[in-house]
Design a protein with these regions (language model features):
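Walker B catalytic acidic pair
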Residues: 87
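Active-site-proximal or metal-binding-adjacent scaffold patches in catalytic folds
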Residues: 1-82, 91-159
Length: 159
């Protein structure tokens, strides 16, 4: 599947989230946040996503690997809520759709709304996506919303 809006999504992140590529969590806090996301997702008997978190050195990209069922973050720039939430949104989208398509953007936006310290509103997210010419699916139809909207996971305690 062609990833037609990848560069648009990256540009949007860079403008919407100040210091996107700046570390703001420790490795331990990334693990705690990841564990809370996993606990929230797997809290229902009908959902079981086996996923691990790995850290590596280097200046390349961070990624989600569906085949290995892991999220990989870089020590030098990937230790932040926004990068972890970006990669977790890929895991929720699970390769069924375009990598940075509407489903991914909706999942990522909901995760930012719920778990980023600034808690951007859906209105703010939609306006910024519109301004960046990024397509998205309905936030409240996303898997992230269905799973996490009523979950009181303690991500704030992770950081």
């Amino acid at each position: 599947v062609r990833d037609r809006q990848r560069s648009k999504v990256y540009a949007w992140e860079g403008s919407f989230i100040p210091d996107f590529h700046k570390n703001n969590l420790s490795e331990d806090n990334c693990v705690k946040m990841f564990d809370q996301l996993q606990k929230g997702f797997n809290s229902s008997d009908d959902r079981n996503m086996k996923l691990s978190l790995r850290f590596i050195n280097g200046h390349g990209r961070c990624w989600h690997s569906p085949s290995r069922r892991e999220i990989v973050l870089r020590f030098n720039w990937g230790l932040s809520r926004q990068v972890l939430l970006h990669e977790y949104a890929h895991a929720l989208t699970d390769g069924k759709y375009e990598s940075h398509g509407g489903e991914f953007v909706a999942n990522y936006s909901v995760l930012l709304h719920l778990f980023h310290p600034k808690h951007p509103s859906f209105r703010e997210l939609a306006q910024s996506l519109r301004d960046a010419n990024v397509d998205w699916s309905d936030f409240k139809s996303s898997l992230a919303w269905k799973v996490f909207r009523r979950r009181k996971i303690k991500i704030a305690e992770a950081a």
